[in-house]
Regions:
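Accessory, non-ATPase domains that flank or precede helicase/AAA+ motor cores in DNA-metabolism machines
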Residues: 1-364, 376-392, 676, 708-715, ...
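Inter-lobe coupling/hinge segments of SF2-like helicase ATPases
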Residues: 199-206, 210, 214, 223-660, ...
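Extracytoplasmic/periplasmic
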Residues: 657-670
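A carboxyl-terminal module marker
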Residues: 668, 672-693, 732
Length: 738
């Protein structure tokens, strides 16, 4: 028997297997996915590899094939299902097998496990008394003191013995040699769930919530494992639906994974789950120490926990019997990996569930176009919650035209309506959230007099300003010189739109000096528990106003917040991205959902230069269907996902001329060798930021209805690029439907 083994090293260009012979004694035990020790290279140094294929045919002369040394012991290994998942990632997202394996195995480097040592008495009371008498006669004070303590308490922590009883390691060793006691060790798992106290009263479900739970549970009990899109308006109680269905799955001896979009959600989310399921819950996030992450991996693997909460990486928790995967706020961009492999957690979750026989719940007040499109086409099941749980109603929304504010002479960041409502809420001792809809480095260019945004005439996305003043489209490469006069109204108030949270904070303190202000952005949340500290302060009423970027509108529930101010809705609306309208609608709807979630009524003020835009109007009305109908028509017209599939090929190099030639070669290869009906290949164009740290980047887009066609193209390209000397100093990456 022969095994195809992939080496446990990370190198983008290394994506091939090595064939090894399987020793007779391992033929009956070796399995796909096992970690094995192998001799490698001319010096036969021992390294670790993974079995990714088994067969009886030798690919090389038999005398040249080396033997596997043995199965790796004592390390976290890639089990068969993880390797199958890695192969699926490779095929669907254009990465190497090594990169896929390192993604699906959460912890690769074994961290030294913390251990707790205790001294245990292993003789009966009569024997202990005899030894005690002997020690008294011999004046062996330390031994007498230790045995006396063990008679009273048969198990004592070793640290107490050394610190409180002043007993040395030699005395403990002597007790072991004499057969009086033994030292036992147990792994100490670091518990990342902190500050969870008290009990939470179980909430009575309303009729819509009950129907949602009953639907999912009935299908589950019948073995009909589906993917559900739980479309619930903000405050409709989606989390209670998650809790009920998870409890049902756990009662059947299976496990659940709950994905959250980013670390800021853990403060409230973990408490709600921990109150229901106790220490069976754990969390995983990027700010945890390596040791903490390793502990959670082991706890899941050994069955000590049943619910894992975390961002997209928590999806790869090694549960043995996964029954349910919940993706809360499924529309969030954070579920898409920005590093290779550029997978989407939603797609991977559905694949894992299909393989494991599990259900998936995708929850959102503003579903992604992909999920809603799938529901409309019958690929997943739609469940709707269209009313708020409890007594909270939807907030009143004002759309303020900033062009009119400018005409009235108001050049501050606060419209008259927002300033008026802020004064009112501060007087009532109610809380306010101010949201700065900020994205990216390069801003869009617009006219402050009439609101016109400079767009690409070919792609219907905003042009991005470069350092030299040129405006460029990063989808097709269209370029135009710097614009100083508005082509629509002739005004010279044409500029890039940029703002910052610090500037907003300064303006708030100047306008409302008596207000207690907190700012939540990347600068103020550095450190392990930065998010939780700020959210806790605000939740406890220690601030009147919370200012922040996207992280403040992601699912937080603050009952005393009755006013949400969106300072500049246009900042995301005109980013150079075909998803700009969708992201704006989602952010504005989520922002509006933060106000008036309890008994108090809420207000939302949306400030914008384009008050008539359909995404802003739909968000103000909380009308998802109206938004979807207009947006899907635009996607179909332009051939963007989910109507079509879009693959972005990214090339980068320190050699600009080499990069230009390489990008031209890729474009020509696709045009000449990938003759699929309906295929479009656009580019190459410069990347949004063409040069970073002396590395130049170009982009090529490939569109087609069939996802498998794009998979086939990136595999064909890989075959021709890997080992090609012309691409030795060019990095090529793929991003599908990013």
């Amino acid at each position: 028997m022969y095994a195809d083994v992939i080496i446990d090293i990370s190198h983008e260009q290394l994506d091939k297997t090595f064939q090894y012979a399987v020793p007779d004694e391992l033929v009956d035990v070796i399995e796909l996915g096992m970690s094995v020790d192998i001799p490698f290279g001319a010096g036969n140094r021992q390294i670790t590899g993974y079995v990714v294929g088994l067969g009886d045919k030798a690919a090389y002369p038999v005398e040249k094939i080396k033997y596997i040394t043995g199965i790796t012991e004592g390390k976290v290994t890639a089990v068969s299902r993880m390797l199958k998942l890695a192969a699926w990632l490779k095929h669907n997202y254009g990465c190497t097998m090594n990169q896929a394996i390192k993604t699906v195995i959460p912890v690769k480097d074994k961290v030294k496990q913390k251990e707790k040592h205790s001294v245990n008495l292993i003789i009966d009371a009569a024997q202990a008394q005899k030894y005690l008498d002997t020690f008294a006669k011999k004046n062996a004070k330390a031994r007498y003191r230790l045995l006396e303590a063990l008679i009273k308490e048969p198990v004592i922590d070793e640290s107490i013995i050394k610190s409180k009883l002043n007993i040395t390691a030699q005395t403990v060793k002597a007790f072991e040699d004499m057969g009086i006691a033994e030292v036992r060790s147990e792994d100490m798992y670091r518990n990342p769930v902190r500050n969870v106290t008290g009990e939470r009263k179980r909430i009575e479900l309303n009729e819509q919530q009950k129907n949602a739970v009953d639907t999912i549970i009935a299908d589950y009990d019948n073995g009909d494992y589906k993917t559900y899109l739980l479309h619930g308006v903000t405050g409709s109680g989606k989390t209670e639906v998650y809790l009920e269905t998870i409890e049902h799955v756990l009662n059947h001896g299976r496990q659940a994974i709950v994905l959250i979009p980013e670390i800021a959600l853990t403060f409230q989310t973990v408490q709600r789950f921990y109150h229901r399921f106790g220490d069976k819950v754990s969390i995983m996030n990027s700010r945890m120490s390596k040791g903490e992450r390793y502990d959670q991996f082991l706890r899941a693997q050994r069955g000590d926990i049943s619910v894992m909460i975390g961002p997209r990486s928590a999806l790869f928790t090694p549960f043995s019997n996964i029954g349910l995967i919940v993706i809360d706020e499924e529309h969030e961009g954070a579920y898409k990996s920005e590093t290779v492999p550029r997978y989407h957690a939603r797609e991977v979750a559905c694949h894992i569930a299909k393989e494991a026989g599990a259900s998936v719940i995708l929850g959102s007040a503003t579903p992604s176009m992909e999920s809603y499109y799938a529901a409309m086409n019958g690929h997943i099941q739609l469940i709707t919650l269209d009313s708020r749980a409890g007594s909270g109603g939807l907030p009143a929304v004002d759309i303020v035209d900033l062009r009119e504010e400018l005409r009235l002479g108001n050049r501050t960041i606060f419209s008259n309506r927002l300033r008026e409502l802020m004064s009112d809420r501060l007087a009532k001792h109610e809380q306010i959230m101010l949201f700065l809809n900020k994205r990216g480095v390069a801003g869009f260019i617009s006219c402050r007099s009439c609101g016109k945004v400079m767009k690409c005439p070919h792609c219907d996305v905003s042009l991005t300003e470069h350092a030299d003043g040129r405006l460029m489209c990063h989808y097709c490469g269209y370029t135009t010189p710097k614009i100083t006069v508005c082509p629509s109204c002739g005004s010279r108030y044409v500029s890039g739109f940029r703002a910052g949270t610090e500037g907003v904070e300064a303006q708030v303190k100047k306008t409302f000096p008596q207000a207690r202000v907190l700012r939540m952005d990347m600068d103020t949340t550095r450190g392990k528990d930065g998010h939780e500290k700020i959210l806790s302060e605000f939740a406890n009423g220690n601030a009147d106003i919370l200012i922040g970027t996207q992280m403040i509108v992601k699912g937080h529930d603050f009952p005393n917040v009755t006013l949400m101010g969106v300072l500049a809705a246009d900042m995301s609306l005109y980013s150079s991205d075909y998803r700009a309208s969708e992201r704006t609608f989602q952010l504005l709807t989520q922002a509006a959902g933060r106000a008036g979630r309890a008994e108090k009524s809420g207000n939302v003020v949306i400030q914008t230069y384009t008050p008539e835009h359909f995404s802003i109007v739909s968000a103000a009305n909380q009308d998802y269907n109206a938004f979807y109908e207009q947006e899907i028509a635009y996607r179909k017209l332009c051939g963007y996902p989910p109507a079509d599939n879009l693959m972005k090929i990214m090339l980068s190099s320190q050699d600009e001329m080499l990069l230009t030639k390489g990008a031209a070669w890729v474009k020509a290869f696709v045009d000449n060798n990938c003759k699929y009906k309906g295929l479009m290949c656009i580019g190459p164009a410069d990347a949004p930021i063409y040069k970073i740290k002396d590395v130049y980047s170009k982009i090529i887009y490939v569109k087609h209805k069939d996802r498998e066609v794009l998979n086939s193209i990136h595999e064909k390209l890989d075959v021709n690029i890997v080992g090609n000397q012309a691409f030795k100093n060019i990095n090529v990456q793929y991003d599908i439907n990013g």
